[in-house]
Amino acid sequence: MNNKNIKEEFINAFGEEKWNELEILKPLQDAVDLVCKEYLGIKPIPVVFEALSEDVARYDFKLQAIILNNKYKDDYIEVLDGCLHELEHHWQRIYIANNDTPKARRWKKEFENYDKYNQTQEIEIDACAFSQVILSCEFGLTYKHPNNYIQVLIDDYIRSRKILLDD
């Protein structure tokens, strides 16, 4: 069976929208796999699209997957940023489970008292900073937080090298 037949059979079984979704997911999954391997040293995490109420992306602990809001599937940079952000949250939890540093204790406390609407939490600033650094260095893409105040905090976090320190 050739690629054209596979595509036709898939579309007949699941519909053209699902095929298009797979074509969008492939480069995202490849990017996530690369970052897991080269930057975080963790096993790859599956990426899927679903209907989400508001977030661009979230990490599903039960499924061990990154769920992307299908409303954003045409905005590659936005969903790639969401993937990287959620990957960093996954890595933060691994870090917390395996380390007893001041940073691990702060992050643990922030996860235990998580406030979805407080974007100034260190775990959020760290995830945003990680995403922006990887987008720039690995993919040559620029993404800035839509809130200028939060972006200043992210820039300060990156400049301070806290992203690299175990303080």
Residue ranges and their predicted role:
Residues 81-94:
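Active-site recognition of the HExxH zinc-binding catalytic motif
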Residues 1-4, 92:
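N-terminal low-structure segments adjacent to metalloprotease catalytic domains
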Residues 20, 24, 28, 80, ...:
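Hydrophobic (often cysteine-bearing) scaffold residues that line and stabilize catalytic clefts
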